[in-house]
UniProtKB/Swiss-Prot annotation:
Any one Pfam family match given in the protein's UniProt record, by short name: DUF4149
Domain of life: Eukaryota
PANTHER family named in the record: TRANSMEMBRANE PROTEIN 205
Record family assignment: Belongs to the TMEM205 family.
InterPro entries according to UniProt: TMEM205, TMEM205-like
Compartments it resides in: Membrane
Name of this protein: Transmembrane protein 205
Any one cellular-component term (Gene Ontology): membrane
Residue intervals passing through the bilayer: 18-38, 54-74, 86-106, 168-188
Membrane topology of the entry: Multi-pass membrane protein
Keywords tagged on the record: Membrane, Transmembrane, Transmembrane helix
Length: 188
């Protein structure tokens, strides 16, 4: 492992804690919390909660990934990297970019369109049902009758899909780096 000096125990612990924090947060938000929430509250409550939590989530990811990249970069100068370390550095960098795209662009754009959709849905008595499969025909009818709603829905799903893709790419990057870190531990 190419390094410019050995990291202190504090730096090692910080690096491990930050990576673990970002990975655990991604697991919780991406694979658990949303599915539990959508099955327990109305669609509009779900959207409102997500609109408040996601900015915090994306900025925590951005900060955590940036700290991980910075710590890794300090102890792995570019001139001394082998190909494994180059891949790790690239994965940290990609994770930062993905979190940044979500925090600055995809998340806010999806939220903005969702809030417009919710206003239109309220006017038509939709959004108070629990779960996604409730009253599908009402949403289909609204899409067919209201071009503004249809446009915002299309834009929302585009940004939501891009946000999910960025989130999964970032999760993959951090997972690979966490696995690599675990495989290189001296002991547990």
């Amino acid at each position: 492992m190419a390094t410019e000096g050995d990291p202190t125990d504090f730096v090692k612990v910080l690096h491990l804690l930050v990576i673990s924090f970002t990975w655990g947060m991604q697991v919780w938000v991406s694979f658990i919390a949303g599915f539990v929430l959508i099955s327990q509250v109305s669609m509009h409550t779900f959207g409102l909660v997500q609109s408040k939590l996601f900015p915090v989530y994306f900025y925590c990811l951005l900060g955590g990934n940036a700290v991980s990249l910075a710590v890794y970069a300090v102890y792995h100068p570019r001139e001394l990297l082998d190909w494994h370390e180059g891949i790790q550095m690239s994965l940290f960098f990609v994770a930062v970019i993905m979190a940044g795209l979500n925090a600055q662009w995809f998340g806010p754009s999806a939220t903005e369109n969702m809030l417009v959709m919710q206003e239109i849905e309220k006017e038509h008595g939709l959004g108070n049902q629990v779960g996604m499969s409730s009253n599908r025909e009402g949403y289909t009818k609204l899409r067919e009758q209201d071009p503004k709603y249809k446009e915002h829905r299309s834009t929302f799903y585009r940004y939501h899909g891009l946000s999910n893709l960025c989130n999964l790419i970032g999760f993959f990057c951090i997972t690979v780096n966490l696995i690599y870190l675990a495989l290189n531990l001296g002991t547990i």
